[in-house]
């Protein structure tokens, strides 16, 4: 049941089930609905959705809910193809079509220019990308030991827990080959990986950068030390796995912080640029 605020509005309560229609989206991909005058943010919802929503958090001016059941889907809703989308923190709009995503992003820009800039912009249509899959040319993978296994992927939403998702659809397929080879090599050669709590362990991140015009890939290992054990064997195997590799770089970062790259780099093999 709901209760009234001092202003006479109905206040939602935690675990309450309410019917809601999504009428807008926030810039972080949450659908927005209003029930009894209260704004509700609902992850993984789409404009036009009619939902049964379970309230999970109630604040003074707005609430958060989760989808209990989809009563009617909005036109922009699609079935996301990523198996870890709802756990990984890398994407926000995979549950809606690309066309719908562009509409909302254009609206975010226009709203900010009007509300924050005090402008009346003449908006031009967004030019869509010719590639919606495999377009990323850079990736930074935290490397951690989880359940006795060396794991590389992306951080879960609002956490530093690594989600094993080397096979992300937004990156080229050969990124996955490099990630899988690297984690397997570290595991088989008992090379330690970084632990954020203790500040100990060697390998912190795997950083990949691809030049589409040159078809070349730079591989960078970020380490909490001076050198990589078995570096020559790592490089030899890496070149066999991915022929696009043009350089292998070691980045030194001994700082106990969230900053990924340190200030010192050393090229282990290949081009310096």
Predicted feature residues:
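Accessory RNA-recognition modules of RNA-modification enzymes
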Residues: 2-273
């Amino acid at each position: 049941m709901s209760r009234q605020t001092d202003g006479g509005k109905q206040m939602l309560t935690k675990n309450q089930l309410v019917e809601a229609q999504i009428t807008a989206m926030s810039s972080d991909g949450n659908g927005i609905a209003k029930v009894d005058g209260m704004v509700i943010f609902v992850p993984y919802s789409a404009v036009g959705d009619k939902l049964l929503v379970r309230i999970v958090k109630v604040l003074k001016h707005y609430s958060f809910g989760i989808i209990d059941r989809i009563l009617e889907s909005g036109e922009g809703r699609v079935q996301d193809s990523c198996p870890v989308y709802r756990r990984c923190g890398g994407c926000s709009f995979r549950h809606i079509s690309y066309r719908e995503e562009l509409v909302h992003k254009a609206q975010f820009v226009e709203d900010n220019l009007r509300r924050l800039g005090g402008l009346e912009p003449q908006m031009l249509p967004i030019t869509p990308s010719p590639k919606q899959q495999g377009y990323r040319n850079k990736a930074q993978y935290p490397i951690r030991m989880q359940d006795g296994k060396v794991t590389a992927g992306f951080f879960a939403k609002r956490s530093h827990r690594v989600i094993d998702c080397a096979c992300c659809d937004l990156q080229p397929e050969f990124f996955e080959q490099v990630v899988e080879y690297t984690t397997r090599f570290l595991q088989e050669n008992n090379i330690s990986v970084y632990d954020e709590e203790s500040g100990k362990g060697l390998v912190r991140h795997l950083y990949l950068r691809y030049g589409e015009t040159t078809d070349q890939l730079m591989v960078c290992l970020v380490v909490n030390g001076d050198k990589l054990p078995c570096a020559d064997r790592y490089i030899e195997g890496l070149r066999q796995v991915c022929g696009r590799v043009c350089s292998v770089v070691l980045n030194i970062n001994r700082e106990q912080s969230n900053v990924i790259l340190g200030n010192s780099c050393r090229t282990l093999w290949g081009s310096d640029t």
